[in-house]
Each structure stands twice: as structure tokens, then as C-alpha cells.
Amino acid sequence: MKRFRIICAVVAVIALLYGCSGNSFESPAGLADNPKAIPVETESPETELPATIAPTDPPEPTIPPLGAGTGSHILSYYSDEYEDYLDYYIHVPKDAVAGMPLMVFLHGDGEVSRLDLIPEGGISMIANEIYGESFPFILLEPNTRIESWTKGNIPKLLFELVNAVADEYCVNTDKIILTGFSRGAIGVWDMISIYGGYFSAAVPVSSPHQKGHIDYIKAAEVPVWTFAGNIGDIERWYHQYLAQNVDIINGCGGFGKFTVLHGCNHVQAKNAAYIEETFEWMLAQERGVIPEG
């Protein structure tokens, strides 16, 4: 019995020395399943954070991967509210970034229901001659299927399209420009009569408002520069109305300017009006800011 006790004591000492040596050993079978086993909690050392974090420059914002992306595209916009659609041509510069101006051009009768003619009949080719492929703006050219920009829900549908494109391409909402030629110019007058200061600049070329009446108070919220040629009865007839329009806009505290394009008939007036000076003026305007005389 005494010998048995000595053996047990020796075994206990050996086990104690083995456990303190830092070597691992396997637990006896069943110990891990023992519900009375108490887990040993270990504390992880706290990580000391730096007092300040060096600021980093935010990445340059880019166009989100929505819609058609960069380049020139022919697309269609459908409105659930009005159950109608507008086809449109859009040019997004290849180096486009968020915050670019948006220029909206309304065509004349020659392109009605002819979306395929928009690239040549609009102003994209003119802009390309001035700026090359890298426009300093996104160009939107909607296409109407009837000879009007003012009938029915077209103004509301057009406004909805402009808003959708502005949101999709993250444009600078303080630089949304509206311009148009001939019947498109009538649409410009109509749109600024309804939405006024939503736009940063308005340039109607070769046409006053069809009805000879606009909401001058609303139109005075946006700077207006209008043009007309001086060859042909139609162009000369426009002069009295356009001059009257800008005079009243100026009288309402707005900015109105009328330029006669000497030596130009109705068709020639478009190329004469859309020159680099005109584009730069449009791009320089900001929503809610009326330039000085």
C-alpha cells in the first residue's frame, strides 16, 4: 500500500512538471465534452490608434455605370405618368465626369420623327467642329414625333426626360442649358415660360413664341440670348417680336439680348448663331444668376 502511494506521488510530480514545461498534450478523451469544463478566457491586447488620421484626397467623381455610358447613342425614354415616350440622341464625352453642364437642343421641323437626322440636323456636328470629340458638356437632343414642342404633354414629358438624364449622368444642375432652332426655338420660349429658372441659360434661334405671348415674369428668371437672320420676310417678321420679348424680359429684371445675323436667311441662321462665342456664353451662365447688361 505504501509502495502504491509512492508511485502515485511520483506520477503526479511528473505530470506537474510536464504541464509547466510549455509543451502541449492531448486532453483525456471526453474532457472536451464534459459539461462542467470551464473555458479559459484570454484577453487580446488593445491596439493603440494614432491620434489623427492623415486626410486623403477623395477620388475624382465619375459618371456612374448607368444608361448608355460615354459616346453617342440613340435611345428612348418612356414616361409611366404620361404613358408616352420621347426618342433622343445623347452625346457623352469619353472623358466625362460628374458635374458637367447639360445642354438640351430642340430641333426644327426638318427632323420631326427623323431621329436618324439628329446628329447632322442638330448641333452636335457644330460642337464637334469647335471642341472636337471632348465636348465640355453632355448634349441631349430629343426628337418630337409631331410638328410641335408645345402641344399636349410634350413640355411635361420633355421636362421629365431632362430631369432623368440630369440625375442619371450626375450633371451640374446649376448649368442646364436650353436651346433650339426654328420650331425648336418656339419650344424654348414655351419651356422657360413654364419652368423658368430651372434652366441656367436659354438660346432660341430664329423664332419667337408661336402665340406671340409668353409668361415674361417666369422667363425673366433665366438669361435669354435670341438670334434671327435678316434675309427673307419670315426672319424680318421675327425681329419685332423678338425685340419686344427681350425688352419686356429686361423690364422684368431679367437679362434679354437679341442679335440680328446679317446676311443670313432662316436656314443659315443656325450655323451663324451657334459659334464658339455663343457656346461659351451658354456654358458661363449659372442657374439663378442674372448677368449684368
Model-derived regions: residue spans:
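C-terminal catalytic histidine-bearing segment of alpha/beta-hydrolase fold enzymes
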Residues: 225-293
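Gly/Ser-rich "nucleophile elbow"/oxyanion-hole loop immediately N-terminal to the catalytic nucleophile
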Residues: 94-98, 147-182
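A domain-start/cap signature at the N-terminus of enzymes
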Residues: 20-102, 179-181, 191, 244-256, ...
